[in-house]
């Protein structure tokens, strides 16, 4: 039999400037896979390329792993010195790695959901290219099973691990249902946009303002919502349940007195303020106003760090699940070694006149080989010896029965 193996680079072993040179687009992957199968000793191969990893999952690589790595570097027109960044895993260790990747336990952010879709896409491309077969089909199926178990039986994806999503989680704690909540996004910072987009997905009503009106209009097209003029910001402030501030201003654009007026007009209904700007755009004193819940980027990062610690604990539980699934897979994989022996045993009796003794022996031999494939060769040799001596055994049995019958 061949061997399951993994070769590649990821964020743990190679910097981004190396990973980006090896990265393959969808169209590139479609071209690379047939070349790898045709020009290296591979029976099956798939390639997973994301921003954090470029990994080849393969079967029947029985020669030096450098053959594959050299071919990949040749395709990407890279210097052989890049080989030093590659890692190689074989057999059970390779299967565990694939399952771990698909379960997001090997991700930079443990529990992130994107990797499952990326793994499925990598398999789809390989299947369409005709470069996967019996072994990698099974690896894929069981990797997804492992991934599902990890997500449903642990809490790796329950808590927010991005600053933007942490802001949304805090907003939900304060307001409960976010449907119909009015959100004001001030500025065009990336994290602010992400937080606003998350809130919109939960049904919040989005309002956007920016010093540059055209930029606000552009954001409205991307996120949907209403545009407010920046100079009217303080007039609209009391109407907003959630305020996200993410501008490039060097000083405070909202001060304590702005929120004192705002909560009075809101009759002290809670107002959630997220200041993701660096330097901060909201006077920290605003957090002391009754009804105002002010969080800056450090507050959110603290939430994220606590959540990450919790995910790491859950990941340890996930690894136990992975090893359980790897063991099941390896039992199936090892059983494949016995298939030729089982077929040979079956062929020895099918369509032939054989004694019940031989039939019983074949049945027992097959059962034992399935239970322990390592002994298949020995069992087959013993069976052939018994089968060869079967005529002599019959003759002796007849003589014995004749003597006793006389």
Curated annotation (Swiss-Prot):
Could you tell me what reaction this enzyme catalyses? Answer: (S)-4-amino-5-oxopentanoate + tRNA(Glu) + NADP(+) = L-glutamyl-tRNA(Glu) + NADPH + H(+)
**InterPro entries, sorted:** 4pyrrol_synth_GluRdtase, 4pyrrol_synth_GluRdtase_N, GluRdtase_CS, GluRdtase_N_sf, NAD(P)-bd_dom_sf, Shikm_DH/Glu-tRNA_Rdtase
Residues that, per the record, bind substrate: 50-53, 107, 112-114, 118
Q: Can you supply a Gene Ontology BP term from the record? A: protoporphyrinogen IX biosynthetic process from glutamate
Q: Does the keyword S-adenosyl-L-methionine apply?
A: no
- Which GO molecular function entries does the Swiss-Prot or TrEMBL record give? glutamyl-tRNA reductase activity; NADP binding
Keyword annotations for this protein, in alphabetical order, are: NADP, Oxidoreductase, Porphyrin biosynthesis
Principal EC category: oxidoreductase
Q: Which Gene3D superfamilies match?
A: Glutamyl-tRNA reductase, N-terminal domain (3.30.460.30), NAD(P)-binding Rossmann-like Domain (3.40.50.720)
| Residues involved in NADP(+) binding | 187-192
Where's the active site on this chain?
Answer: 51 (nucleophile)
EC number(s) in its UniProt entry?
1.2.1.70
Pfam families on file: GlutR_N, Shikimate_DH
Question: Where is the site described as Important for activity found in this chain?
Answer: 97
Subunit info here reads: Homodimer.
| Family of this protein | Belongs to the glutamyl-tRNA reductase family.
Domain remark from Swiss-Prot or TrEMBL: Possesses an unusual extended V-shaped dimeric structure with each monomer consisting of three distinct domains arranged along a curved 'spinal' alpha-helix. The N-terminal catalytic domain specifically recognizes the glutamate moiety of the substrate. The second domain is the NADPH-binding domain, and the third C-terminal domain is responsible for dimerization.
- Tell me the NCBIfam families matching this sequence: hemA
Comment field (misc): During catalysis, the active site Cys acts as a nucleophile attacking the alpha-carbonyl group of tRNA-bound glutamate with the formation of a thioester intermediate between enzyme and glutamate, and the concomitant release of tRNA(Glu). The thioester intermediate is finally reduced by direct hydride transfer from NADPH, to form the product GSA.
What biological function has been recorded for the protein in this entry?
Catalyzes the NADPH-dependent reduction of glutamyl-tRNA(Glu) to glutamate 1-semialdehyde (GSA).
What's the protein name?
Glutamyl-tRNA reductase
């Amino acid at each position: 039999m061949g061997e399951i193996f993994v070769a590649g680079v990821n964020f743990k072993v190679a910097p981004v400037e190396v990973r980006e040179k090896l990265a393959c687009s969808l169209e590139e992957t479609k071209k690379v896979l047939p070349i790898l199968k045709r020009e290296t000793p591979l029976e099956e191969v798939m390639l997973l390329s994301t921003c954090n990893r470029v990994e080849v999952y393969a079967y029947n690589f029985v020669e030096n792993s450098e053959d594959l790595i050299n071919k990949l570097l040749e395709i990407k027109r890279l210097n052989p010195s890049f080989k030093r960044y590659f890692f190689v895993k074989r057999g059970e260790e390779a299967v565990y790695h694939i399952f771990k990747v698909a379960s997001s336990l090997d991700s930079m952010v443990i529990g992130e959901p994107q990797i499952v879709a990326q793994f499925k896409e990598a398999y789809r491309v390989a299947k369409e290219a005709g470069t996967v077969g019996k072994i990698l089909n099974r690896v894929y199926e069981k990797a997804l099973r492992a991934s599902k178990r990890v997500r449903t039986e642990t809490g790796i994806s329950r808590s927010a691990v991005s600053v933007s999503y942490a802001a949304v989680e805090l907003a939900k704690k304060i307001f409960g249902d976010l449907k119909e909540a009015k959100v004001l996004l001030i500025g065009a910072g990336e994290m602010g946009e992400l937080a606003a987009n998350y809130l919109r997905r939960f049904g919040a009503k989005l309002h956007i303002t920016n010093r540059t009106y055209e930029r606000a209009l552009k954001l409205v097209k991307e996120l949907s919502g209403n545009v407010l003029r920046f100079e009217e910001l303080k007039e609209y402030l009391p109407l907003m349940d959630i305020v996200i501030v993410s501008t490039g201003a060097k000083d405070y654009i909202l001060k304590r007195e702005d929120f004192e007026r705002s909560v009075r007009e809101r009759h002290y209904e809670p107002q959630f303020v997220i200041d993701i700007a660096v330097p901060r755009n909201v006077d920290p004193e605003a957090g002391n106003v009754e009804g105002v819940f002010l969080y800056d980027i450090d507050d959110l990062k603290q939430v994220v760090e606590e959540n990450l610690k919790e995910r790491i604990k859950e990941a340890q539980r996930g690894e136990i699940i992975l090893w359980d699934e790897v063991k099941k897979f390896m039992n199936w994989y090892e059983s494949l070694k016995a298939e030729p022996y089982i077929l040979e045993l079956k062929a020895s009796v099918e369509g032939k006149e054989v004694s019940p003794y031989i039939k019983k022996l074949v049945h027992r031999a097959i059962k034992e080989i399935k239970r322990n494939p390592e002994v298949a060769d020995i069992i087959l040799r013993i069976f052939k010896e018994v089968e060869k001596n079967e005529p002599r055994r019959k003759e002796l049995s007849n003589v014995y029965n004749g003597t006793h019958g006389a």
